[in-house]
């Protein structure tokens, strides 16, 4: 039993509470000797729990994590066609730089694959910063990669090369959803569907997603809270095979943390230009609050975030038995969880009570109430539980 009582929390605050550990900021030392190669350097990078390293030793360490993630699981076959997602975030630029470096090495060390770069334009208003100038700078720096752009919500045939792209106004379904939580979840699923369609269009067999440990920890908690527990393992795993057309999504930066990403940005003088989700953290949604919670943990208790993230590696993905045949959600492509279960029935029962209200008291018919709950559970049987929750927030129109 816990021996800490209320008296232990006096005017001095939580005396026995967990104390903040190492921050994620790290230290850049102006000059000194590298603890790994022994050479003098004008700038040393001091990561938490690692000795100070010179510019080249740090880059070798970070790039090894990228190569090790792909090599340990043998997830990327030789001469694979890869679609790399660049959204302007720091981690996406790090992944782009690492992949370009791996492709420009000698034959022995070269990563043997062909890469194309995709940017999904999700600007909701013309007043937002135009990403095209920054993308053109990246195209020149990382030649000969081909850069493609497509608008979120557009048809796949509207995919354009960066040099030929011009934005147009589209009618967005997410504006028809009542809550910000539902809108953000829908945009995430819509984005995944579009990525899979573009990969098929460009004949790419693999997609590189720039997710790091802290973002995957936030995604794990968010998926559980949204009712996606059956597919949470694939949401944070190195390999996700739910995209259409047997396209495989890979997360080769999953072992990098925020501190390593920021040091890499500084070392390579990269310029992130994304300001979308991170700027919305003041708006209340389940995703934003979870991200803020994990960011605070990462700042004060970095090892706790690692524990949350590593939990995802121990969760097995829920799969349909082979004899039952494939049965996936029409929106998120996860295995359907809409079978009759006590938990889902209880949720729909509660909703039915709220809907019937006074009529329930007048009729006093519990059988009708349970029948109503079963009908709700069996309706939209092509959607999983979480995607049905999105549909419930839809004011008009259709999700798909």
From Swiss-Prot:
<dbReference type="Pfam" id="PF10288">
    <property type="entry name" value="CTU2"/>
</dbReference>
<dbReference type="GO" id="GO:0016783">
    <property type="term" value="F:sulfurtransferase activity"/>
</dbReference>
<comment type="function">
    <text>Plays a central role in 2-thiolation of mcm(5)S(2)U at tRNA wobble positions of tRNA(Lys), tRNA(Glu) and tRNA(Gln). May act by forming a heterodimer with NCS6/CTU1 that ligates sulfur from thiocarboxylated URM1 onto the uridine of tRNAs at wobble position.</text>
</comment>
<dbReference type="GO" id="GO:0034227">
    <property type="term" value="P:tRNA thio-modification"/>
</dbReference>
<dbReference type="GO" id="GO:0002143">
    <property type="term" value="P:tRNA wobble position uridine thiolation"/>
</dbReference>
<dbReference type="GO" id="GO:0002098">
    <property type="term" value="P:tRNA wobble uridine modification"/>
</dbReference>
<dbReference type="GO" id="GO:0016779">
    <property type="term" value="F:nucleotidyltransferase activity"/>
</dbReference>
<comment type="pathway">
    <text>tRNA modification; 5-methoxycarbonylmethyl-2-thiouridine-tRNA biosynthesis.</text>
</comment>
<dbReference type="InterPro" id="IPR014729">
    <property type="entry name" value="Rossmann-like_a/b/a_fold"/>
</dbReference>
<dbReference type="GO" id="GO:0005829">
    <property type="term" value="C:cytosol"/>
</dbReference>
<protein>
    <recommendedName>
        <fullName>Cytoplasmic tRNA 2-thiolation protein 2</fullName>
    </recommendedName>
</protein>
<dbReference type="InterPro" id="IPR019407">
    <property type="entry name" value="CTU2"/>
</dbReference>
<comment type="similarity">
    <text>Belongs to the CTU2/NCS2 family.</text>
</comment>
<dbReference type="GO" id="GO:0032447">
    <property type="term" value="P:protein urmylation"/>
</dbReference>
<keyword id="KW-0963">Cytoplasm</keyword>
<dbReference type="GO" id="GO:0000049">
    <property type="term" value="F:tRNA binding"/>
</dbReference>
<keyword id="KW-0819">tRNA processing</keyword>
């Amino acid at each position: 039993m816990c021996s800490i009582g209320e008296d232990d929390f006096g005017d001095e605050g939580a005396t026995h509470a967990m104390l903040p550990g190492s921050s994620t900021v790290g230290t850049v030392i102006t000059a000194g000797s590298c603890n790994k190669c022994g050479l003098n350097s004008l700038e040393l990078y001091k990561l938490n729990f690692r000795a100070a390293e010179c510019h080249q030793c740090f880059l070798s360490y970070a790039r090894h994590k990228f190569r090790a993630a792909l090599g340990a699981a043998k997830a990327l076959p030789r001469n694979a066609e890869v679609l790399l997602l660049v959204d302007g975030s720091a981690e996406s630029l790090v992944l782009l730089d690492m992949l370009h470096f791996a492709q420009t090495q000698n034959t022995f060390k070269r990563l043997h694959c062909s890469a194309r770069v995709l940017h999904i334009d999700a600007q909701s208003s013309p007043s937002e910063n135009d990403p095209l100038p920054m993308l053109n700078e990246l195209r020149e720096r990382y030649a000969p990669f081909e850069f493609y752009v497509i608008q979120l919500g557009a048809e796949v045939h509207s995919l354009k090369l960066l040099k030929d792209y011009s934005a147009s106004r589209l009618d967005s379904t997410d504006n028809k959803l009542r809550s910000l939580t539902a809108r953000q979840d829908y945009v995430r699923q819509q984005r995944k569907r579009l990525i899979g369609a573009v990969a098929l269009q460009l004949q790419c067999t693999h997609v590189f997603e720039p997710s790091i440990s802290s973002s995957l920890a936030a995604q794990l908690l968010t998926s559980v809270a949204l009712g996606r527990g059956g597919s949470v393992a694939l949401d944070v795993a190195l390999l996700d095979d739910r995209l259409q057309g047997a396209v495989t999504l890979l997360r080769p930066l999953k072992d990098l943390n925020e501190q390593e990403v920021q040091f890499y940005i500084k070392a390579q003088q990269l310029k992130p230009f994304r300001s979308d989700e991170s700027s919305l953290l003041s708006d209340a949604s389940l995703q934003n609050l979870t991200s803020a919670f994990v960011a605070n943990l990462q700042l004060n208790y970095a090892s706790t975030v690692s524990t949350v993230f590593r939990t995802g590696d121990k969760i097995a993905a829920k799969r349909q038995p082979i004899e039952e045949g494939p049965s996936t959600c029409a929106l998120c492509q996860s295995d359907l969880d809409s079978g009759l279960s006590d938990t889902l029935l209880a949720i729909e029962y509660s909703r039915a009570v709220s809907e019937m209200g006074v009529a329930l008291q007048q009729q006093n018919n519990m059988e009708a109430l349970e029948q109503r709950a079963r009908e709700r559970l069996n309706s939209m049987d092509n959607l999983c539980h979480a995607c049905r929750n999105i549909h419930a927030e839809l004011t008009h129109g259709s999700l798909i």
